[in-house]
From Swiss-Prot:
Gene3D superfamilies: ApaG domain. InterPro entries: ApaG-like, ApaG_domain, ApaG_sf, Uncharacterised_ApaG. It holds the Pfam family DUF525. Residues 3-125 form the ApaG domain. This is Protein ApaG. The gene is apaG. HAMAP family: ApaG.
Length: 125
């Protein structure tokens, strides 16, 4: 699990290995993200940037609009939660990134997604 707070936007992520959807050389992980507006000004998530690293040091960058087809607008005190997935070639790695947020007044900033592990249970000492 990881948590980061940037300008009142809290991002918490939990990841889970999905053995039923994995096979040798293809390890599927789901991750659930909770984005909460703990600040005093509404903000909208407009885009995402993920950096995915595997155990071989391979790096993949994923950039796109919104999350799961949405660009959630969060009033103070509101939160948005979604689940997505990632496939690695190795049994462990990590993800991190940012969400581009825009306040109702037009101020844009990047909310940090702190690094979180993607690990097949029993593969690390």
């Amino acid at each position: 699990m990881s948590t980061a707070v940037t300008e009142g936007i809290e991002v918490t992520v939990r990841s889970t290995f999905r053995p039923e959807r994995s096979e040798p050389g293809r390890f599927l992980f789901s991750y659930t993200v909770r984005i909460a507006n703990q600040g005093e000004v509404p903000a909208q998530l407009v885009s995402r940037r993920w950096i995915i690293l595997d155990a071989n040091g391979e790096r993949e960058e994923v950039v796109g609009d919104g999350v799961v087809g949405q660009q959630p607008h969060l009033e103070p005190g509101e939160h948005f939660e979604y689940t997505s997935f990632c496939v690695l070639k190795t049994p462990h790695g990590s993800m991190r990134g940012t969400y581009r947020m825009v306040r109702d007044g037009g101020q844009a900033f990047d909310a940090t997604i702190a690094p979180f592990p993607l690990v097949v249970p029993g593969t690390l000492n």
